[in-house]
Amino acid sequence: MNQTVKVKKKKKTITLGVVHIRASFNNTIVTFTDIQGNTISSASAGGNGFKGARKATPYAAQVTIDRASAKAKEHGLKTISIRIGGPGAQRESAMRALFGQNFVVTSILDVSSIAHNGVRPPKRRRV
């Protein structure tokens, strides 16, 4: 009788981490990492059941932060540094949702890339 025994993987306890928030025009992606950049947890508005234009709403960003931070708290994350990027309207509500999660925030950094006359912007929308 050969039985295979599955060993449960130990969860690492990480107390200090970085939150990367990418707020684009179409979606919000949140990633919790440790200091070295190894992913602890991640979530996106599209992965949380929001489809189409609803992915780019501030409420979708709030739900995304809640889901990702719940996973990160299981690993013992308490102190975070925030790196937020992108042109989306969800930035402010994502920050407020993070402050409501009882993390100790050490720094907030805006890592949005600024084009120095880069690619041509999309044409104007006609409704």
Swiss-Prot record:
- PROSITE patterns from the xrefs? RIBOSOMAL_S11
Subunit structure, interactors included: Part of the 30S ribosomal subunit. Interacts with proteins S7 and S18. Binds to IF-3.
Protein name, entry field:
Small ribosomal subunit protein uS11
Is Membrane there in the keyword field?
A: no
Biological role stated in the UniProt entry = Located on the platform of the 30S subunit, it bridges several disparate RNA helices of the 16S rRNA. Forms part of the Shine-Dalgarno cleft in the 70S ribosome.
Q: Which InterPro entries match?
A: Ribosomal_uS11, Ribosomal_uS11_bac-type, Ribosomal_uS11_CS, Ribosomal_uS11_sf
Task: Give GO terms for biological process.
Answer: translation
Give the UniProt entry's GO cellular component terms.
ribonucleoprotein complex; ribosome
Q: Which Pfam families match?
A: Ribosomal_S11 (PF00411)
Instruction: Recite the UniProt keywords alphabetically.
Output: Ribonucleoprotein, Ribosomal protein, RNA-binding, rRNA-binding
> Family assignment?
Belongs to the universal ribosomal protein uS11 family.
Q: Name one GO molecular function term.
A: rRNA binding
